[in-house]
C-alpha cells in the first residue's frame, strides 16, 4: 500500500507506475483505493463510478474497470458536504462532520471489494488518501492505516521533496502516528527529486535513522508523468503541458470543476494552447474557444462564473465570433434556465443560464451513468465516451443536436450559427476524428497523434523510471 506524507505527493502516479511495471513482468495486477475524494470520476461497464485515478491505474494493469477498485468515492458538493458513492452507486450525502459516523459502516464494503479483487489477482497495489499523519481522522479510518491494519497490507510511505521539508514530512509522520500504525510502514520513498542524488544521501540516511524505516527509493522527476491525467483540481494550478499553438482555448476554473481530464487530449495538439483562467483573471480576448468543463455544483458554479465577470467576457467573446463549448455542467450553464427543485446539488432553487443555447435544465436525483458511442451530427466524426450527470436538458435547441448516439438518440445542442454547442458526453476529444473536426472549425488542423497511444507510452515510461530508481524485487517480497 502506497501512503503519503500529504496530498499530491505522487501516490496515484506511483501506483500506476508500479501496476504497469509488475504487469510488464507478467503478473496479473489490479489497483485499489479504499476511499477517494474527487469530482473526476470514470464510468464502469456496469454503470458504476470510480475515481479517474483508479481508471488510469486499471489501464496500467490492462484490466477492465470495476467498482471494487474504488469502493468509496466522495464527490464534494457546495459548502463542506459530499456525495457518497459506495461500490459504484450513490447512497447519500453528508457534511464532513457527519461523514465520520458513516465510516464504520463503510469498512465492510471496503474489505468486501478488496477481497473480491484479491481473489482475481497476483498482486494488488493499494493507494492511500491524503496524509497518513492526519491523526484527527484516524478513528474509524478506512482510507489509510485503518484499512492497512484491517486487511494486513504492508505500507510504503511517500514524501514529496519538491515542496520542501521532506525530512520533517517523514520523521514527523513517525512521531505523531500510533506505534501500531508505524509498525505497518516497511520503508519510505522520496519523490519528485531534482538535481544530483548524492547531495541528498545524508538526508536519506538521517530519515532512515530517525524513523527506523529503510529508504526504498529516491525518485527523480519524470517528464513523461506530466502527460498523464491529473486527478485533483489543484493539479490544474501546477505546471502541465499546455502547448504553444496558434489556437488559444480558454478554460475557466470554477470551484466545483469536475472531469477536467476532458482537456488532456487537447494538450497533445501542437496547434493548441490551453489557458486555465483562475479567479481574478479575465477570459483572454484572443481565445478562439472558451470551453466550460463539467461541474459537480452547476448552479453554484454559475453564480461564481458571474461573480468573476466571466459572463461579460463570454458575451464579448461571442460577439467577436468566438466559439463556445460546454460539457456536462458547462452545457447546462449555456442554456436559458437551470432548476433544482429538489435541492439535488444544494439548496433548492432556480437560476438564469447564460442564454447561449435555447435549452433549459432540470436537475433530478436520477443519475445517468453510461458509456456513450456515436458520431457528430454535422460531419459524422465518430466518438466513444461516457455520460455522468444528474437531470435532463430539453428545449427547442435540442432539435439541432451536436451528436447522434449509436441508438439514434439526439444528444446535445448547437446554436443556429454553429459557434456555441454543448453536450453531456465526456471523453469526446480522446477521439482523433473529434479533435480534428474541432480544430478545423477553429482554423487549425489535427496532428493525427493518438491520445490513447500517448498514455500507454507515458505509463511505460513511468514504469521504467520506477524500475530504475526503486527496488521492485524487494517490494514484491514485502507483498508476499
UniProtKB/Swiss-Prot annotation:
UniProt GO BP: cobalamin biosynthetic process
Top-level lineage group: Bacteria
Known pathway: Cofactor biosynthesis; adenosylcobalamin biosynthesis
Signal sequence range: none
Domain named GATase cobBQ-type: residues: 246-434
Record's keyword terms, sorted: Cobalamin biosynthesis, Glutamine amidotransferase
Iron listed as a keyword: no
InterPro entries attached to this UniProt entry: Class_I_gatase-like, CobQ/CobB/MinD/ParA_Nub-bd_dom, CobQ_GATase1, CobQ_N, CobQ_synth, GATase_3, P-loop_NTPase
Database matches in HAMAP family: CobQ (MF_00028)
PANTHER family: COBYRIC ACID SYNTHASE (PTHR21343:SF1), DETHIOBIOTIN SYNTHETASE (PTHR21343)
UniProt function note: Catalyzes amidations at positions B, D, E, and G on adenosylcobyrinic A,C-diamide. NH(2) groups are provided by glutamine, and one molecule of ATP is hydrogenolyzed for each amidation.
Listed name of the protein: Cobyric acid synthase
Naturally occurring in which organism (per UniProt): Methylocella silvestris (strain DSM 15510 / CIP 108128 / LMG 27833 / NCIMB 13906 / BL2)
Lineage: Bacteria, Pseudomonadati, Pseudomonadota, Alphaproteobacteria, Hyphomicrobiales
Amino acid at each position: 500500500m502506497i501512503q503519503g506524507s500529504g496530498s499530491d505527493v505522487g501516490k496515484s502516479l506511483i501506483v500506476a507506475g508500479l501496476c504497469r511495471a509488475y504487469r510488464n513482468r507478467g503478473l496479473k495486477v489490479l489497483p485499489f483505493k479504499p476511499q477517494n475524494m474527487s469530482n473526476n470520476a470514470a464510468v464502469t461497464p456496469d454503470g458504476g463510478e470510480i475515481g479517474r485515478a483508479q481508471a488510469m491505474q486499471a489501464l496500467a494493469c490492462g484490466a477492465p474497470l470495476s467498482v471494487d477498485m474504488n469502493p468509496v468515492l466522495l464527490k464534494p458538493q457546495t459548502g463542506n458536504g459530499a456525495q457518497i458513492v459506495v461500490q459504484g452507486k450513490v447512497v447519500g450525502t453528508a457534511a464532513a462532520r457527519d461523514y465520520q459516523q458513516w465510516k464504520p459502516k463503510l469498512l465492510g464494503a471496503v474489505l468486501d471489494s478488496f477481497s473480491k479483487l484479491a481473489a482475481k489477482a497476483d498482486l494488488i497495489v493499494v493507494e492511500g488518501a491524503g496524509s497518513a499523519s492526519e491523526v484527527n481522522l484516524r478513528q474509524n479510518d478506512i482510507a489509510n492505516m485503518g484499512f492497512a491494519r484491517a486487511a494486513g497490507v504492508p505500507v510504503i510511505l511517500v514524501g514529496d521533496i519538491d515542496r520542501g521539508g521532506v525530512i520533517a514530512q517523514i520523521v514527523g509522520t513517525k512521531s505523531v502516528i500510533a506505534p501500531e500504525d508505524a509498525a505497518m510502514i516497511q520503508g519510505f520513498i522520496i519523490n519528485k527529486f531534482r538535481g544530483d542524488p548524492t547531495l541528498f544521501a545524508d538526508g536519506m540516511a538521517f530519515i532512515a535513522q530517525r524513523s527506523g524505516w529503510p529508504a526504498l527509493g529516491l525518485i527523480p522527476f519524470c517528464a513523461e508523468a506530466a502527460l498523464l491525467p491529473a486527478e485533483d483540481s489543484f493539479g490544474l494550478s501546477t505546471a502541465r503541458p499546455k502547448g504553444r499553438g496558434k489556437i488559444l482555448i480558454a478554460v475557466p476554473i470554477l470551484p466545483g470543476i469536475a472531469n477536467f481530464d476532458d482537456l488532456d487530449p487537447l494538450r497533445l495538439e501542437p496547434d493548441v494552447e490551453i489557458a486555465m483562467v483562475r479567479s481574478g483573471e479575465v477570459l483572454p480576448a484572443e481565445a478562439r474557444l472558451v470551453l466550460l468543463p463539467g461541474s459537480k455544483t452547476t448552479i453554484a458554479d454559475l453564480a461564481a462564473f458571474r461573480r468573476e465577470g466571466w459572463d461579460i467576457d463570454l458575451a464579448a467573446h461571442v460577439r467577436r465570433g468566438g466559439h463556445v463549448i460546454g460539457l456536462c455542467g458547462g452545457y447546462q450553464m449555456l442554456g436559458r434556465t437551470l432548476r433544482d427543485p429538489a435541492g439535488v446539488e444544494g439548496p433548492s432553487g432556480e437560476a438564469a443560464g447564460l442564454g447561449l443555447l435555447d435549452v433549459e435544465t432540470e436537475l433530478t436525483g436520477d443519475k445517468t451513468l453510461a458509456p456513450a458511442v456515436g458520431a457528430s451530427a454535422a460531419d459524422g466524426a465518430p466518438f466513444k465516451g461516457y455520460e455522468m450527470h444528474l437531470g435532463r436538458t430539453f428545449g427547442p435547441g435540442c432539435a439541432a443536436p451536436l451528436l447522434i448516439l449509436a441508438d439514434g438518440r439526439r444528444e446535445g445542442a448547437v446554436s443556429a450559427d454553429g459557434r456555441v454547442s454543448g453536450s453531456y458526453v465526456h471523453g469526446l476529444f480522446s477521439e482523433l476524428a473529434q479533435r480534428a473536426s474541432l480544430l478545423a472549425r477553429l482554423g487549425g488542423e489535427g496532428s493525427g497523434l493518438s491520445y490513447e497511444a500517448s498514455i500507454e507510452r507515458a505509463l511505460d515510461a513511468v514504469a521504467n523510471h520506477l524500475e530504475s530508481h526503486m527496488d521492485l524485487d524487494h517490494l514484491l517480497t514485502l507483498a508476499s
